[in-house]
């Protein structure tokens, strides 16, 4: 059986049609995006929200379990769940009740609450690692992990794999374009490239060669 070639021109036309239809069906989101551009770059509170999905930006209003609804009344089954950070789903009752109770008592004291000890003890029991430290974002976690690795090893370089994402940290915002390391984002300090190395995932020979140099402080492994 012969297999014909994919008509890429037809695919481009189909994508163009579907993109236009998507925009047409989301007039309220379009209005909010335009309104947002008057006070936020790109019309969104965090710059990465403009390119996270390959469709026009939508604005959610509510979520329940695995589903959420946008301002135009469309309901979605969310297979991403905040990059898996929201693994309990949207608005789980035990979480919302606990948050409401604590908010009424006060929050953000800049002092350690008793619950932090309970959480650390629970994590230690479940995972088997004795000590835990909490951060406000994954980027902060990676930044602190890199610093700890550099202190404990006396080395500087961070080894990563192509296709990775480790947050908005100077030390991990580079990529290997074949002609050496290049910045993934503008404005990164030039010296940051000296502290990183990016290789292909599953290339064991390249990994062994990189580690043999004796200058790798840590390996961050999250190919995407």
Write out the residue ranges for each language-model feature.
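Glycine-rich loop-to-alpha-helix module at the N-terminal edge of alpha/beta enzyme cores
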Residues: 2-4, 75-155
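Active-site-adjacent loop/helix segments that line or gate small-molecule/cofactor pockets in enzymes
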Residues: 4, 11-62
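Short beta-strands and strand-loop turn motifs
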Residues: 16, 48, 77-80, 217-224
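Electropositive phosphate-/nucleotide-binding environments in soluble metabolic enzymes
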Residues: 26-30, 34, 62, 89, ...
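Short, hydrophobic/aliphatic alpha-helical segments
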Residues: 27-36, 69-74, 124-125
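Active-site and channel-lining beta-strand-loop segments
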Residues: 57-78
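PLP-dependent aspartate aminotransferase-fold enzymes
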Residues: 118-221
């Amino acid at each position: 059986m012969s297999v014909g070639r994919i008509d890429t021109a037809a695919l481009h036309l189909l994508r163009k049609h579907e993109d236009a239809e998507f925009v047409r069906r989301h007039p309220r989101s379009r209005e909010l995006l335009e309104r947002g551009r008057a006070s936020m770059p790109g019309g969104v509170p965090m710059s990465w929200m403009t390119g996270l999905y390959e469709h026009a930006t939508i604005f959610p209003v509510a979520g329940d379990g695995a589903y959420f609804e946008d301002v135009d009344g469309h309901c979605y089954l969310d297979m991403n769940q905040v990059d898996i950070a929201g693994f309990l789903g949207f608005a789980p009752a035990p979480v919302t009740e606990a948050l409401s109770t604590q908010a009424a008592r006060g929050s953000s004291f800049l002092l350690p609450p008793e619950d932090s000890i309970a959480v650390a003890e629970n994590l230690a029991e479940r995972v088997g690692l004795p000590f835990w430290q909490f951060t406000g974002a994954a980027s902060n976690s990676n930044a602190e992990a890199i610093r700890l690795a550099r202190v404990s090893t006396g080395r500087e370089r961070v080894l990563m794999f192509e296709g990775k994402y480790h947050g908005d940290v100077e030390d991990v915002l580079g990529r290997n374009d074949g002609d050496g390391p290049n910045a993934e984002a503008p404005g990164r300090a030039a010296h940051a490239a000296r502290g990183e190395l990016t290789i292909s995932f599953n290339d064991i020979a390249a990994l062994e060669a990189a580690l043999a140099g004796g200058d790798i402080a840590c390996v961050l492994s999250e190919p995407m």
